[in-house]
Regions:
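A short, amphipathic edge element
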Residues: 61-79
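Short, well-ordered helical secondary-structure segments
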Residues: 43, 58, 76-78, 108-110
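Generic alpha-helical hydrophobic packing signal
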Residues: 15, 19, 76-78, 121-124
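Exposed beta-sheet edge and beta->alpha loop/turn motif
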Residues: 80-140
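Generic secondary-structure boundary signal with a strong preference for alpha-helix termini
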Residues: 37, 45, 74-75, 117
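Detector for Asparagine
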Residues: 2, 27, 47, 77, ...
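Core segments of small alpha/beta cavity-forming domains
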Residues: 1-67
Length: 140
């Protein structure tokens, strides 16, 4: 293993799995309202992670549902150990268009799709599995 931080580098596959579970968890919350799977992937330090979960929760309030709006992990661009206990993963993601629908089936709001964009996840490898502690939208 060619890394200045071999213990963190050894956790790269598990960190990538956590990022995949984050995307799956957001989509699960969007479909069901159950936020537990996505919350299990990040620490309380990840403000952008928490705001994403809260945004979905807010859209589902009042018995609303969401149609579409899934986020997609298009590619993993890089995954490197950046400190003794940190892995940085750069990905490309996109999001489908969505509709917020009320309990009668009426569309309340529509949201356009988002084109592919780069996102950087920083994960702490002290825990097993690793957890996301920071999320940065690299294109903004």
């Amino acid at each position: 293993m060619n890394s200045a931080f071999p213990s963190a580098a050894a956790q790269i596959p598990a960190a990538i799995d956590t990022v995949r579970r984050f995307f799956d968890g957001l989509n699960h919350e969007s479909d069901t309202g159950d936020e537990a799977p996505v919350i299990a992937t990040f620490t309380t330090k990840c403000n952008l992670c928490g705001s994403g979960v809260y945004s979905i929760k807010t859209l589902l309030d009042g018995k609303h549902t969401l149609r579409g709006g899934h986020v997609h992990l298009l590619s993993i661009n890089s995954a490197i150990a950046t400190y003794n206990n940190v892995v940085s993963i750069n990905v490309t993601e996109s999001q489908d268009a969505a509709q917020q629908v009320d309990s009668t089936g009426r569309v309340v709001q529509t949201f356009p799709s988002s084109p592919p964009r780069h996102v950087i996840f920083e994960l702490e490898t002290d825990e097993s599995p690793p957890k996301i502690w920071q999320l940065t939208r690299a294109d903004e």
